[in-house]
């Protein structure tokens, strides 16, 4: 009896063990099936019925080269008071000229002697003009002489001190009725005090009217950076009578634009301020020689001694105050230069390393 009981217990344990082994086999087989199904699914993704994948290749775009015609502008600090100096300052009955007392003046006749230009003269050796203005003026007269062989030109008016301007003003106003536009500016409000202006006459009759041979000068002066400052049809704007003998230097791109569009300096200054600010559209210009320029206006920060002005890097630029409310920047887009050499004639308020990049724009 006891032996039968032991045999029965062994049989039960054996059956239990076999059952557990069988269950484990089923579980393992199921797990293997799940893993295999997962692998099969990752390796077999059906094609979309909407795409013909025969010969289909994925195109990876090539890295783009930087546009060489794009200019990076940086913010550079300039003395706010510099808005009162430069080629484009507006000096008229409403806007006084503020002298820096260190104008770089040269004697016209001394420069003629140095450069052996004997086909025009000035009244005497005391007649001076800003040095940067002499060369374009002399070159214009030289080209005129080569065409017409006319050596009768004389510079009859150039830089004037305020004291001399006062003498002229007193002399002319004593004989004027006051009914017409003035021909002599109020002291302190004369372009002649800037050194950027000169008056032509001729040594035969001392009556230059820009006619005959001299018409060439009045017609072509813009190519050398000059304008006829007081045009015949702009008296209501300039408040001066027509003066065909009075030439004012503003630079080639600006003289070109004003001449092509028949506008005077007052109108040009207003146009740049209203339409061509740095934040908006810039004036794009090509001169008669094919040189390209980009021009824009930046308002001065009159609440501070320093105005931060966006200027280009890698290309030459000029900056001028307008003597009213800001700065005009002229970018010579064809003239590539190294960083730091964009405008060697301008001294910023602080070191150039303080500049900050602002944005990139494209040259058209």
Model-assigned labels for residue ranges:
Residues 2-158, 162-364:
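Extracytoplasmic cell-surface/polysaccharide-interacting catalytic and binding patches
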